[in-house]
Amino acid sequence: MNGAELLLGEAALARRAGRVALVCDAERVSYAALAGRVRRSAGALLAHGVRPGERVLLLMRDTPEFAAAWLGAVHAGAVAVALNSKLSEADFRHILADSAARLVVVEDVFARARPDLTAELAREGRIAIAGGALPGTPSWRAWLHDAADAAPRDAGPQAAAFALYSSGTTGRPKGIIHSHQAFRHVGGAFREFALAEGEIVFSTSRLFFAYGLEHGLLAPLAMGLTSVVAPDWPESDAVIDLAARHRPAALFSVPTVYRRLLAEPRPRLEPFRAVRRFVAAGERLSPQLVEQWREAVGGELLNLYGMSETFCPCIVTPPRTSDGTRTGMPLPGVELRLADAQGNEPPQGEPGVLWIRHPAQASGYANLPEQTREQFRDGWFCSRDLFVRDAAGFYVHQGRSDELLKVAGQWVQPRELEEVAALEAAVAEAACVPVVDADGLERLALFVAARGEPNEALRAAAAACERLLPRHKRPKWVRAVAALPRTATGKVQRYKLRELLERELSRKE
């Protein structure tokens, strides 16, 4: 078995060889052409010493060249590792060491931004430059020109095929290992949303994210759709332009992008009225955003919940049921259970930690045996997310179990404060963290990023908390920041906010 062969092998091409697989700027790549580029990419890797099971890192923009190289690594039996283009050099070096990468394929624009690291990898014979040429380093396109097509490597369903490096809010990125078996299970959300072969989809999420990789590349290929690929992180103008030009049947994005689009004048959002399905994942989808989007474009925002560890989604909002108050229901083939602190199923309506059994889930974390044993048990994965299941069988996300705080003897979920602050038009985004006060007690601090004037956002957030929250849930401190600090994968770095306030408080002592 080989995951790339499942998507682009003879059986798949017999049905759709001439159909367009990828659209990127002016380039249109058919399924047959993409399959040929994948075979050639695999041949180039094998010709330059990459062996089955070895890691190939790819630091490239989202282009057909990247898609062919990533799938080519899988085709060759290597392990494809797409890297976040916003990685710090320290995290890049960590992944290089952690993965023991045999080769790094780097687009020239990223190589030029890291001259020292590029020179080191060139001396070690572990780099090829994609895109344009870079003097003194091997050219990926020259390798492709000289390579022969390679046959797919029969790797077995449980053999490693790709890894996702997911950074938490603290610590270094960790490698999440997925097998060739995962390719059999992509596209579950597409089926739930009744997307049909030949339709066009557009995902704004980058291909190095699990969400973007499945819904922007692998699932469209598995189901015979055309995917619109944007090379760079798309801003609102680009998203609107691509929707107008390509008229996708479905848009896959994140709540932050939908919120930014809503800041545009309403006439500019007209292209979205032709889109049939709007999907959001990666962060919480609020009832307010669901309603605002419905009012603006007449479309229903549907929620997806999944993790890098499951790769594919686990929970989805069924069409015509979205109001933003419920996450959704499990996709076919996915098993879910809730557990309290003692490992027992909580009563209906009570929160519990979500455990997942998904046919596409990871085998574990690279070089982290203890964490693998802790979170992967007997075929189940512990998400560490809190959920409630209602009487109708819908799951409702309650936040992270490791973010639940006890304040004045009562449990508080920081998300509650963040949601209240986000109701205010002056607040662009908010994050709540615990901070120890002068009496040694843990209290809540709320940080807000303003849409306009910071003091207006501060006043609005504080007033909303005073008005809508019981006393024990109100923040002791409310502070404004230019933007919430985030990791390269977009997660809020709460510890940096806590340190910011701790420094302020220490100066006042």
Question: Positions of the model-derived regions?
Answer:
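Gly/Ser/Thr-rich phosphate-binding loop
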Residues: P248-S253, L262-D323, E335
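AMP-binding/adenylate-forming catalytic core of the ANL superfamily
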Residues: L87, V104-V106, H358, S363-G364, ...
